[in-house]
Amino acid sequence: METKFFVVDRIDGDYAWLKRTDKEAEPVYIARALLPEGADEGTKLKQEFLDYEVV
């Protein structure tokens, strides 16, 4: 599976908008429960195998 890099662009209640930083793509709308604890707007993330970690 492809490794992807994101930044948390916006928090919207129980969901977050993620913006790809490694290539041009549409924003991703994802449940905050899937993100690492403490992830907030501006947090940089790496996604591998549907698992997110702060970078």
State where each predicted segment sits.
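Residue-level signal for tight coil/turn positions that link beta-strands
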Residues: 12-13, 49
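Short aromatic-glycine-enriched beta-strand elements
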Residues: 14-18
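Short nucleic-acid-contacting surface segments enriched for D/E, G, S/T with interspersed K/R
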Residues: 34-47
